[in-house]
């Protein structure tokens, strides 16, 4: 990655959607561009900025002279944490209220003696209000869709699913009567997909459903961007990226971002130390993993937004216990809907010699640890990519959004996962864990995951497809005048 040669640094303003899974890859890309010579302003919501300071310490977001944090309001009541867990509310509020404070921030930055003028914007694919600001200020904007390419294609096709009468559902019975098994064979670049494999916001009977219409609007507005960035790589999703390229502005597949990010030299440790976690990390789990045999531990983490019932928590607990496998299980605050997650005391007693529970962890490092043999996951895109980079096979339990699409591809196209299909029952979970860790199917998936790991490393190595895509999006878009 050659640094930018310029008398005055280019200044990129980054705007992630205010959720953990969106902030993480956005921060990795921001740090990479800073390493390449960009001045960075990273814009969190006021609410999330405060949460990060609480989880990481009061100086965590002091930044560096060339990497600054700023905030804008999200339009919701300042102290209402529940409102931030209501995704439709957050999407509706940010899309309607954030433009004016964002433009005011850009004006402030442009007149600040402490930073060069803003030269480009890198914004989340679902923060398209920023496009109006880019147009107003006459600067290029790249949209970073933090989804898989197959997930993005699912969203891009929402308007056709509506046109064809496939969504909204005609009747609540359609959720469970086999309707979701309807084959969808007309989406360019996608094969062997069903209605149930589309991003989950189609699962509504409400013709005015906020998320359905929000995603139609955001994908349509994406056409105004100077370019689109995806955190994927050509070998993994070439067919669907090619199809997307006929529907959207130029697409640059620059992932998995964690690989070039990990290559930033140690003299930039101040930059690498800038964190993005909304929860405090437990790093003790890495020491615990050091005591375990290679490929012996099941890692369990359902991400930052999944919610389950207490009954499901209990069934997962006993499924893990009965498998007799060592496990590291991340149970974040809020995992169980409306109550504190409490695993059965008998489960704790039964597994005390082989299990570890924590509330959050440095997942990338965990998935790169030699002790990890399998990953029970919600199949968010970051988790899927991080597993690929570690060569770790998956048991998939999707919660919402494009996780359903990621699962379909993980299990049928990429050969790295098995899906929990149906109700969460302890015997079923026990059987899947044993299959993953000891069975022939698990061995095949591990072999496939290691093949993808090597292809990901090839893509991000010098002259690899993702390496060149990142160089090109910098030189052709971010350092060029707006068309």
Curated annotation (Swiss-Prot):
| CDD domains attached to this UniProt entry | GT1_Gtf-like
Instruction: Summarize where an anthocyanidin binds, as residue positions.
Output: 22, 401
Q: Where, by residue number, is the active site?
A: 22 (proton acceptor), 124 (charge relay)
InterPro entries found in the cross-reference section:
UDP_glucos_trans (IPR002213), UDP_glycos_trans_CS (IPR035595)
| Assigned keywords, A-Z | Glycosyltransferase, Transferase
Query: Reaction catalysed?
Result: (R)-mandelonitrile + UDP-alpha-D-glucose = (R)-prunasin + UDP + H(+)
One GO MF term on file is: UDP-glycosyltransferase activity
What's the Enzyme Commission number for this chain? 2.4.1.354
Top-level class of the enzyme under EC nomenclature:
transferase
UniProt-annotated binding residues for UDP-alpha-D-glucose: 146, 363, 378, 381-383, 386, 402-403
Q: What does this protein do?
A: Involved in the biosynthesis of the cyanogenic glycoside (R)-prunasin, a precursor of (R)-amygdalin, which at high concentrations is associated with intense bitterness in kernels of almond. Stereo-selectively glucosylates (R)-mandelonitrile to produce (R)-prunasin.
PANTHER family assigned: GLUCOSYL/GLUCURONOSYL TRANSFERASES, UDP-GLYCOSYLTRANSFERASE 85A1-RELATED
UniProt lists the family membership as follows:
Belongs to the UDP-glycosyltransferase family.
- What is the protein named? (R)-mandelonitrile beta-glucosyltransferase
The organism named in the record is: Prunus dulcis
